[in-house]
From Swiss-Prot:
Segments forming domain RRM: 18-96
Biased composition (Low complexity): 100-135
Location (main, coarse): nucleus
UniProt name for this protein: mRNA 3'-end-processing protein RNA15
GO molecular-function term, one example from the UniProt record: molecular adaptor activity
One Pfam assignment: RRM_1
Superkingdom, natural source: Eukaryota
Other facts: Present with 6350 molecules/cell in log phase SD medium.
Any one of the GO BP annotations: mRNA processing
One CC-aspect GO term: mRNA cleavage stimulating factor complex
Subcellular location: Nucleus
PROSITE patterns the record matches: RRM
PANTHER family: CLEAVAGE STIMULATION FACTOR SUBUNIT 2 (PTHR45735:SF2)
Amino acid sequence: MNRQSGVNAGVQNNPPSRVVYLGSIPYDQTEEQILDLCSNVGPVINLKMMFDPQTGRSKGYAFIEFRDLESSASAVRNLNGYQLGSRFLKCGYSSNSDISGVSQQQQQQYNNINGNNNNNGNNNNNSNGPDFQNSGNANFLSQKFPELPSGIDVNINMTTPAMMISSELAKKPKEVQLKFLQKFQEWTRAHPEDAVSLLELCPQLSFVTAELLLTNGICKVDDLIPLASRPQEEASATNNNSVNEVVDPAVLNKQKELLKQVLQLNDSQISILPDDERMAIWDLKQKALRGEFGAF
């Protein structure tokens, strides 16, 4: 797990609190993804991601309230310097113990803490393609996709947002699930560019579609893994050819089998593991979804 030391002294010097500040968040990260990350270090009571009220864009930082001091201490220990995408997160105790009462002055303080790092990073605006800085913003999504139904709040008592998705899908009759897959397939064929944009803005829809395909017996796990792996494989095929020629295939197969076993651990099994192991498994799952390990 890649890490980088260092966090703003103004944050680090705050006394221990159940509320922590998490900064230097890539702008394409949604509240659900940050909640998923934070839930791996301890039970989350509340999460508030900050958005610019004028543009709806993420400010690149959030406040997270954990259930107890032990969990918030674990977050500071494990998330400060943690690499998320191309950024290294900043995590420290917040000066405000009430996540809903962050004043304008305090927001400006955290804007200053977070600003230099994000302004100098790789989060520059790009007028071409989807506006990732608006990802997860309800107003932006409703304008781009007016027929998209409003979502529901994530139940923070669930272990992960993935469990929330499974719970909601289980409430739908099989006929409704199959109808969704049929309609979504028809729409993506008619509007391929919009479909790509929607899935980039709402990555949870990819999980919904994959789960429906699996639970309805339309696909198997082995059918879906190559689809997630293909873009990464195509991008790095040239570089990997020379490496694969000198690596023992038996060793590669053994590594892939071990990785597959780890990725098949359920949330209950993961929840009893130590903090560092939970974070490592979460990291592996994110890399697998991005196709960094290729097909297996």
